[in-house]
Curated annotation (Swiss-Prot):
This is Mitochondrial inner membrane protein OXA1. The lineage of its organism: Eukaryota, Fungi, Dikarya, Ascomycota, Saccharomycotina. Disulfide bonds: none annotated. GO terms for cellular component: mitochondrial inner membrane. CDD domains: 5TM_Oxa1-like. It is a multi-pass membrane protein. It comes from Monosporozyma servazzii.
Length: 371
């Protein structure tokens, strides 16, 4: 019995051990099938890449939807006020972009043209004033020379009265001559507004360009916009400025030809959004100059004709730097004259004040005399 029990336990042990070895071997045999099943269930690298691209596209699409709503620029820290030029320009760009659906390059062009159209009546008045001044240029030059030559306060006042009378008789209000200077804060506003939008960058600036400048946040790689801007600036200066009536001397014409060429390296690192504004603004200036030089348009707009006077040969032969130096000397002389006349005026006022003090009569009543 004991031997039988021992043999039974031994056979049972062998049976269990065999089962264990058999189960381990079966597991190892099934391992490749399990790995293949896991590999088929996991996404491939291409699928993961496509999924990531879809997520990025959806995110950019959601941002693009935000940029087509009023208030987007304000939400990212731009267009914060309604009184600062750059903020006003950004508000205008946003309204045109949202309500017209134009891409950003078209929005910049549209807002630039709209602003210039609003300013066109001011340039009409300025052109008319310049033309009227050209009629009386010889008389005005004579009066101005007399005013610069005198140091007597009374005589200077008489000459100034003659000058005002001459302007009044010809219906000239020289305040319109400074009207085109309004373009300066507007240009600075456009520059700061577009530069801030490109530096952020605003959604759509990176892919809503046109032609060779698709990315409005980068500089023009071919400098095409810079050369266009320089060309139109030279054209409108040769045509008589934005009013179409300015008469530049020879040195000043050469100066305005060289200046746009200098602007090419100065603007080569600016974003294409900023230089696009310069190009469109300059192109409009050329068209405006052609309109204001046209006799039919001048007649319809009731603008006086420009009277051409022969230039001074001594000034015509001088160089650019000589002309600049002459203008600086003239400005300095005028400043010194104003200072001397102001000192003389203050001295006369002081003498009159002392004279009035000395001539003051004290009134004494009779009761005071009895005392």
């Amino acid at each position: 019995m004991g031997v039988a029990n021992t043999s039974l336990r031994y056979s049972a042990f062998n049976f269990s051990l065999g089962r264990r070895f058999k189960s381990t071997s079966e597991t190892l045999n099934d391992l490749p099938e399990t790995i293949s099943e896991v590999q088929t269930q996991l996404p491939s690298i291409d699928q993961m890449t496509n999924a990531t691209a879809d997520i990025v596209e959806q995110a950019s699409h959601s941002v693009g939807e935000l940029s087509t709503h009023i208030g987007y620029l304000n939400s990212i820290g731009l267009a914060q006020t309604w009184h600062w030029p750059a903020d006003i320009i950004q508000h205008a760009l946003e309204y045109v972009h949202v309500y017209t659906g134009l891409p950003w390059w078209g929005t910049i062009c549209t807002v630039t043209i709209l602003v210039r159209l609003l300013m066109f009546p001011i340039y009409v008045k300025s052109s008319d004033t310049i033309a009227k001044n050209s009629r009386i240029k010889p008389q005005m030059d004579k009066v101005t020379k007399e005013l610069m030559a005198t140091t007597d306060l009374a005589e200077g006042q008489k000459i100034a009265v003659r000058r005002r009378k001459l302007l009044s008789e010809n219906g000239i209000k020289n305040r319109w001559l400074a009207a085109p200077m309004l373009q300066l804060p507007i240009a600075i506003g456009f520059f700061n507004a577009l530069r801030s939008m490109a530096n952020f960058p605003v959604d759509g600036f990176a892919n809503q360009g046109i032609l060779w400048f698709h990315d409005l946040t980068l500089s023009d790689p071919y400098l095409g916009l810079q050369f266009i801007t320089a060309a139109v600036l030279m054209s409108f200066s040769r045509l008589g400025g934005e009013t179409g009536a300015q008469q530049f001397s020879g040195p000043m014409k050469r100066f305005f030809i060289i200046l746009p060429l200098v602007s090419i390296p100065a603007t080569m690192n600016l974003s294409t959004s900023v230089v696009l504004y310069f190009a469109i603004n300059g192109t409009f200036s050329v068209l405006q100059t052609l309109v204001l030089r046209n006799k039919w348009f001048r007649k319809k707009l009731n603008i006086a004709e420009v009277v051409q006077h022969p230039p001074d040969p001594t000034k015509e032969n001088s160089g650019i730097f000589a002309a600049i130096k002459e203008n600086m000397n003239t400005a300095r002389e005028r400043s010194e004259k104003r200072k001397l006349m102001k000192e003389e005026e203050e001295r006369v006022h002081e003498l009159i004040k002392k004279k009035r003090t000395n001539e003051r009569i004290r009134i004494i009543r009779r009761p005071e005399l009895k005392k």
